[in-house]
Structure formats: C-alpha cells, structure tokens
Amino acid sequence: CGRVEAPAPLFPVPNARQLAWQQLETYAFVHYGLNTFNDMEWGYGDTPASTFDPADLDCDQWVRTFRAAGMKGVMLTAKHHDGFCLWPSAYTEYSVKNSPWRGGKGDLVRELSDACRRHGLKFGIYLSPWDRNHPEYGREEYVAYFHNQMRELLTGYGPLFEYWFDGANGGDGWYGGADEKRSIDAKTYYGYERARRTINELQPEAVIFGGTCADIRWIGNEEGRAGQTNWSMVKGRGDERLNDFTCGESDGDTWLPGECDVSIRPGWFYHPREDHQLKSLSRLIDIYYESVGRNANLLLNFPVDRSGRIASADSARIMEWRRALDAEFAHDLFAEAQATADNVRGGARRFSAAKAVDGRADSYWATDDGVTAATLSLRFEQPRRVNRILLQEYIPLGQRVGRF
C-alpha cells in the first residue's frame, strides 16, 4: 500500500525559528546595570557611568546556576531605559568604558555571551528603545543611533536566540540635560520594519519580542501566568486588549506564541530590601504550570546583586524549584504502558498510538480525516497511581486542541 500522508496543516503554523524557540520552554532573564547600584527600577538617565563598579562580577556563576536549574538560555538587559550600555558602544560615552569596572576595558555583553557558549546555553539580548539619557531621543538622530547600536549587538556577540524590545516608550528623562518629558509614536518612530529586516539578516535564528514586527508576544502580565486555553495565534499582530495577549485567539491568522516574563523577586533589578522577599517554592512551581504548562515559554528573571553575582538565596530557591519539578516528572509511567487507539490514521505505524507516549517531539498519534472524537487507551501490567499528565500537541501542523 502507498504511504499514508500526514494531516494537512491547520494554518497558521510556526516558522522554523518560532518552533525552535517554543521547544526551549524555560530560560533566564538578567536585569543588571546602573539601576542595580541606584536601588531603582527605572533610572532617569543622569547617573554617572562611574557608579557602575561590581567588585566580583562572575558570568560563569550566573550561567552555571541557570544550567543547573534547567534553563536553556539567558537574556541580558544590554541597555535599559536609563541608556547606560553594558558594552563599550562606539556610539556613546555612557557605557562601561567610562566606569571603573575592569579599568574601563570591560564588556559585560561579551563576558555573558562567552560564558553561555562555554556552558552550552543560548544567548539573547534586551535593548530598550527608550533612552532617557540620549539628548536626541524623540528626534530622527536618535533613530540612527538606535539602529547603529542594534547592529553592534547583532554582529559582535555570536548567535542570538531572541532579541527583546521593551514596550516602555517616552516620558520624562534627563535627555542630555534637557530634563523634560518627550513623547513619540512607538509604532512609527523607531523604524521597526527596518529593525526586523536587520535582525532577520544578521541573526536569522533569533525571534523578535516587542515592536511592531514581533515573532512572539507578551502574555499580558508580569505574573508568569498564561490563559486557559492559550492559543499561539492572534488576528494580525494582536490589538491592545490584554485578553488577546493572555489567551491568544482560536481563529487567529498569525502565529504569535506567548512568553511569560516574571521575576523571582518583587522587582526586576536588585534591591537589598527584597533579599527576603523571594517567590515561594510553591509559587514558582505554580508559575511553571501556568506558563509552560499552558503553552507559553517562561522567561524567569534574576536580579544580579551589586557584587555581580546571583544572590545565594536566589540560587538556593531556583535549585529547590528544579529538584521539585524533577521529582514530579521523575518516572514516566506511560513509557511502560501498552498504548492502543480506536482510530489510527490509515492504519500506519508512523501515526500509531505508541507515538503518543514515545517521548519524542517529532512523532505523534493521528486519526483519519473527519474523525473528531477518538480514544487513546493505556494499559498497565498492574494498577498505577498517576499524579501528573503531560499532554503536548504536534504544533508544526498548527494548533487544534482547545481544551483538555
């Protein structure tokens, strides 16, 4: 008999970089910069670069922690809203090159990207479009500066898996001493279509977060919570209704999967007063199930402390989290069960019930066209107590399952 064809795709479907990104599931965010030393979340842009002076910065310590916790990559705030650059940009003096750290010769973006390669983690970059330090922000001259810095980061630090544009845009700031409020139209000012072309050309494997040409979407909150059900589709690029971000749209025409960004502490940057305010183990476990367990990726933030290291309490908590999850998924009971189904596509082995429990992301059980209700049965040699069920859909063909 002839080869049984796979089910037809249900469009939209993910492109290659979106699919690779969704398979990562969890990765770390690092907020670090002048705000760390100012005890602030959003710097005004007027703090001297000399304020940045970590005494014991160790990117290997960060990455070892993330890898041990099961994270697949790291995102770094290369420049936050205050405009201070963690690399020695050729286009501004407001960077690490004018700090005492490493004698003005340091490059934190380089150190972290190199550490990621040494330890086998992917590396991504956050670049704030808003710059409260730059005197030309709000004018065309700043747009050229923004794109020049973007090209520096895209070409100087190896392969990137994600490029992050923050949604905070315009407001009061230092702006080179003007000390005023400036407003822009975020949809048109930055030239995001040009940015997309540049990123796709120089970093073809990187998904884009934010802006007007994104590959992935914000989940609509900073709590680490996706909706039930969370569709990977939206209409167009989505609108401003938070429900569209949190749940997606079942009849969407654009594949735009969700990312849950949340911090292990109350703030994104390090604050000594929050040393005893870490999220509890139970809350972190809930976050995992409410993000990854609801068809979203988890971007978990770690506010590196003033010394340049992940605080010991943060490291201990995330390792508790890892051990707890490993224990919950330690024994795959379905792997020892006999799987049968009342319908298998064309009777073909490649779509058999066994493919649903083989632990592979590239195989799946499928039914004949027109079958909208089918039964998958698992038989054990003896009674088994089940505490978790992990169900996944073969998304290269689109998203069909509305609820479980």
Predicted regions and their residues:
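Short coil-to-beta strand junction motifs in C2/discoidin
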Residues: 397-404
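Extended extracellular/luminal ectodomain segments enriched in beta-structured repeat modules
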Residues: 371-373, 381-390
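Hydrophobic residues in beta-strands and at strand termini
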Residues: 341, 378-382
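Mature catalytic domains of secreted/periplasmic carbohydrate-active enzymes
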Residues: 1-358, 363-370, 390-392, 399
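Well-ordered beta-strand positions in beta-sheet-rich domains
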Residues: 375-377, 403
